[in-house]
């Protein structure tokens, strides 16, 4: 790509100190985010998705530390930021929607005041002007009767409405980048679709770039322009949404795609990924996914694969792409995935 990224993470490493031991949660992750795009970071729980992206807003837990790499934003390395530096970035330029809206909201404070605080802090509005902006934001995220709702508390809102409030707080300052950490968890399918459409509408109106953190490839298909797949603290494959769904190469990506709901034979066992992710307290030798991969190559257990370029926009960290490797066939269930998704009405990506 000729265009310049607005965030460029290079070889980022993050280590946590736990009970006197070191846990390497992120292992040399590199990722670019471009202006106006929607990037999905997908993987199992514990893969490092949230930890990695929290570095973009300076919100690592106190026992976590960036121990390698760089994250460039506006020509500055965010790994070197002080808390004073973050005050001009967090919320104002890069905002984050957390997974659980109930824990993101103060139960003792009225909803309107919580949105108003964000506006006062980052936009410099005060009094009636800030209140008016907060009410307008409630209306913008689809909350009916915003003047009345402004005076209510979080417990008076449904889960879907609370998520709209959290999105309103994040978007109130018109950030350049919005990070959404599992924004539709625990919401029913209808509300999930409404929340995704809301974020899409706000992105278009405000010109934001959006990062989705999710384990749900169904969400990815609906929202993403590009996808990065994470496993055991590493990005193992990245590409456009079409490349990841229809031309994936990493065996972990294959396993995730196999777990997509499909029209199958009645009584057929649902696919699962055998085994468990590696213990990140221990040094990982070779390909981290090899012990769970039924078709692992001998080299997978002894040497970590590099990234092999599939196209200008697509690369995968797997020995399967080495010219010397035996030819590997994709699992039968994800062959002709374009046709199968079309039959289920899910072939139209990102909209």
Please provide the spans of the model-predicted regions:
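Conserved ABC ATPase "signature" region
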Residues: 77, 129-148, 257
């Amino acid at each position: 790509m000729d265009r310049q990224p607005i965030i460029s993470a290079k070889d980022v490493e993050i280590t946590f100190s736990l009970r006197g031991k070191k846990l390497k949660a992120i292992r040399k992750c590199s990722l670019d985010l471009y202006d106006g795009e929607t990037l999905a970071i997908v993987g199992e729980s514990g893969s490092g998705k949230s930890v990695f992206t929290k570095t973009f807003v300076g919100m690592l837990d106190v026992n976590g530390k960036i121990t390698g790499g760089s994250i460039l934003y506006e020509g500055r390395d965010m790994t070197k930021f002080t808390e004073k530096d973050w005050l001009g970035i967090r919320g104002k330029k890069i905002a984050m929607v957390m997974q659980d809206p109930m824990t993101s909201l103060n139960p003792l404070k009225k909803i309107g005041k919580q949105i108003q605080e964000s506006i006062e802090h980052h936009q410099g509005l005060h009094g009636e002007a800030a209140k008016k902006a907060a009410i307008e934001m409630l209306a913008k995220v689809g909350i009916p009767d915003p003047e009345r709702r402004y005076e209510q508390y979080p417990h008076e809102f449904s889960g879907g409405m609370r998520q709209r409030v959290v999105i309103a707080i994040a978007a109130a300052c018109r950030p350049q980048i919005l990070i959404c950490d599992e924004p539709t968890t625990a919401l029913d399918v209808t509300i999930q679709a409404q929340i995704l459409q809301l974020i899409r509408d706000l992105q278009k109106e405000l010109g934001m770039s959006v990062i989705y953190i999710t384990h749900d490839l169904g969400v990815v298909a609906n929202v993403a322009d590009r996808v990065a797949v994470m496993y055991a603290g590493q990005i193992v494959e990245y590409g456009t949404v079409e490349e990841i769904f229809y031309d994936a190469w990493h065996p972990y990506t294959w396993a995730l795609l196999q777990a997509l709901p499909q029209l199958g034979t009645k009584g057929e066992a649902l696919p699962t990924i055998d085994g468990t992710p590696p213990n990140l307290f221990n040094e990982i030798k070779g390909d981290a996914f090899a012990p769970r991969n039924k078709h692992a190559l001998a080299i997978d257990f002894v040497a970590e694969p590099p990234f092999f370029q599939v196209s200008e926009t697509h690369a995968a960290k797997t020995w399967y792409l080495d010219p010397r490797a035996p030819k590997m066939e994709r699992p039968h269930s994800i062959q002709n995935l374009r046709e199968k998704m079309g039959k289920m009405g899910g072939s139209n990506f990102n909209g």
